[in-house]
Amino acid sequence: MKIDLNCDLGEGFGVWQMGDDAAMMQIATSVNIACGFHAGDPDIMHATVKLAKQNGVAIGAHPGFRDLHGFGRRPVPGITAAEIENLVAYQIGALQAVAALAGHKVTHVKAHGALSNVACEDDMTARAIASAIKAVDPSLVFVVLANSKLMLAGEAAGLPLAHEVFADRAYEDDGNLVSRKKPGAVLHDPNEIAERVLRMAQDGAVVSVTGKVIKMRTDTVCIHGDTKGAVEIARGVRRKLEASGITVAPFAGT
């Protein structure tokens, strides 16, 4: 069995830094890099891509809504499909250009924050994201929440998919993530998270907040770089998986 560990990195801006990217880069096998809309800037993007290349880590674009102040975690009411296509294509292209400068290659795309959350439940948003990815490069792997409308849109567009589960987030009974506004939405205990991820990988399922077992294909596991104790959590997850005979490797080539 093989599984990927992905992490959202490069989410600083100017002199402001978030998380320990250098430490996470030694644990993750794929990283999703902010492209300047919810976080990131040309210098941070370039430094993050170079760090990934040095560590043999696959890189992907992490497009979000244009919302630095809200870190891309706030929906944008009234946004059109064309506007979503444009902002996604723009951000993918930006990372592709920076990656070329750093001698690396973009292999995948994963939507960020509110853009992803809305798309998991809204057909128009999901289709617009998939359409933009396909137009830019149909070989890019689309990282999607398993069983979501994002997954269906990716399938309909004929994109290669990587089905994602979240190590440090709680699930609702419908398979969507519990809102960060609710208590218990983000998990922090490293041992609990490691055991949880092992069960996800072995069983192909997640357990919701009410105890419901939801079948989900698991190609990649996300550990958020901005979660408190992220490095310790990521190390624990990787150790647990490898100790159980599971190969930890990127879903796309580096």
UniProtKB/Swiss-Prot annotation:
The keyword Hydrolase applies. GO terms for biological process: carbohydrate metabolic process. Its EC number is 3.5.2.9. GO terms for molecular function: 5-oxoprolinase (ATP-hydrolyzing) activity; ATP binding. It catalyses: 5-oxo-L-proline + ATP + 2 H2O = L-glutamate + ADP + phosphate + H(+). It comes from the Bacteria. Keywords: ATP-binding, Hydrolase, Nucleotide-binding. The keyword Hydrolase applies. It is an enzyme of class 3 (hydrolase). InterPro entries: Glyco_hydro/deAcase_b/a-brl, LamB/YcsF/PxpA-like. Forms a complex composed of PxpA, PxpB and PxpC. Catalyzes the cleavage of 5-oxoproline to form L-glutamate coupled to the hydrolysis of ATP to ADP and inorganic phosphate. Belongs to the LamB/PxpA family. This is 5-oxoprolinase subunit A.
